[in-house]
Amino acid sequence: MKNMKKGFTISVMTAVLCIICICLIFHCFDGNKSEKDNIFRTNQKKIEILQDGSWTDYEIKGVNIGTGYPGVFPNEFGISEETYARWFNLIGEMNANTIRVYKIQSPWFYKAFAQYNETHENKIYLVQGVDFREDLMFSEENLLNPKQKNKVFQETKKTVDALHGKNITFDTDTGNMCYYSNDVSDYVLGYVLGVEWDEMFVDYLCRFNEGIAPYQGAYISSRQEANAVEIFFSQWGDYLLKYEDETYGTQKLLSFANWPETDPLVNEVSPKLSVASATENTEAFIDLENLQLSDKVESGMFASYNVYPYFPASLQYGKYTEYIDDEGNRNPYRKYLMELVDHHSCPVIITEYGVPASRSPAYKDVWRNLSQGGNNETEQGIALLEMYEDIQKAGCAGGMVFTWQDEWFKRSWNEKSLSNPDGRASWSNAQSIEQFYGLLAFEPGDGKAENYPDGKISEWSKEDVVLENNDTKLSMKSDEKYIYFMVQGLSDIKSGNSINLALDVLPNAGTTYTKNLDFAIPVDFLIQINAEKGSKLLVHDDSDLAVYSIAIKNKSAAVTDIYKKAEELMLPLKNNTDTFHVASRASGSVNNFLLNEKPLENVGMLKHGNANPNSENYDSNADYCINGDIVEVRIPWSLLNFYDPSKCMVCLLYTS
């Protein structure tokens, strides 16, 4: 055993020495930097690019790229080099000139990125994010102390080195060693540091460090009126610009992530909405105007904002709703962007904008229906065009669509407690708004979905039949996104009669009867198809997740009121054991709930249409299709209370 330990120790020491040697080889050039042209700069409120020896305006027409891919989580680097190469070609074909990533990507991402630009005349430039770990944001330690700052600065250094092809990274999450050898710095437009900052974190940091002295750096300084977060930003940005300039002889544009929750504007929201405001009277604002660049900076700084038309409340009820655009429409989104541009002396980039093509909505845009969900793919595309027009007419220097690809691992605020965190990447939750912002969708199944409700039976086989009675057949199948049903042989489907499919999903729940219907076993859900009156998914009260998701899982300052309202909603149902009602989910916000506005969305209302992408009348959100005596319907797993269909896990309520 002693010899084994000795041998293991020698092996570890040898590996460490090899890594040190490689790192020394990568960084031996530090004292002999080579000067590089700075090809991007800011000029007042414009970004400019150096082309053929002269500076010309550069409008960012970009798209964000995430790290999600079906079956893998982001830290697994599960997207191949070949996939990235294909994606860059598609992004170039749609006339985008910029991409943005949020943190260091895999080495093969940068390899494919370099190869694309080396072989294409029209380049795609990169806005590189520098990750800010959430554990730092919510730790009790002060972010401005040297220990915490050093963690952020080391991640920054690692990111810069990776872009210049001079980095070796050991990923503690996966155990992988990543070698970055492709220098893509010629194709880097700039950096966006950090994340959407939690407003309570910003407020806490400012109050905790009240009275701190401004920072005076070689490249960036903070003004006298800067708060603690802005002072930290000046230190962070100064470190990055100084390190890259002194080490690699180049400068890139610089920005810091921001969003409406921490913007520097004064947003007057309708007084009634303040009842549940957790951030009222806070100091939660970040203003880049309180950062000052020195003469050493040849590149410049831009303001970065992630702005969506449906959030926050100030865009739905505040002063911005009074603005009428040149098309004669109320347009609070454009007005808000105009105020951002007016406020800043530097270019403003909308680094995230978009709407998801999810089946159901959460936050709603009451003015132009640019809502967070409830859009099919066609409506999503139209919404993106409208938002980009707003970005241009507001005077922004560009915008970046959120996002390139759908991401199955994502969770949404109104669904996060209803799915298994460890299994989200293995299936597609059609109810999750966060999973469907992508321009690129991932079909479940092997290359295509198991079935598209389109009124055709070519996708069905004898093996799918589960019940047969005379000339009537019921067939079923499933994939990573839906469970599918097909009824064939009922000649009176369009005569106003209903088809009822009873489903027993949950143990110790359900009922054996309801109005006009009896069941051999307790059932939890009813799929009710009616060509004239509309179709719906009904849920028994024992299996209802809607109120549960608000009352039990919503952490808010006014949680007592939520419990009370939940009880009022649930009691009438619990006293009637045969009650079925349309399946619902939380919608809007806690504000809506406390103000007696509609807190729930009837997601069980089924939409008729053709879900086949090859159809001329394709509707990506169609739930069912009737064609002659054929009825096809698909139901998302989550609407049947599946917690993780990949592991056959369901949510149980009101059980011991």
Language model: regions and residue ranges:
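Order/disorder boundary and secretion-linked terminal/linker segments
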Residues: 427, 431-554, 558, 585-610
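Aromatic-lined carbohydrate-recognition surfaces of secreted/lumenal glycan-active proteins
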Residues: 171-176, 230-288, 346-353, 401-404
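Aromatic-lined substrate-binding rim segments of carbohydrate-active enzymes
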Residues: 83-144, 151, 241-246
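Aromatic-rich peripheral "rim/lid" segments of glycoside hydrolase catalytic domains that contact
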Residues: 363-369, 379, 390, 394-397, ...
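Active-site-adjacent substrate/metal-binding segments within catalytic domains
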Residues: 34-116
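Glycoside hydrolase catalytic-domain groove-lining segments
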Residues: 279-366
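Conserved small/polar residues in nucleotide/adenosyl-binding loops
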Residues: 654-655
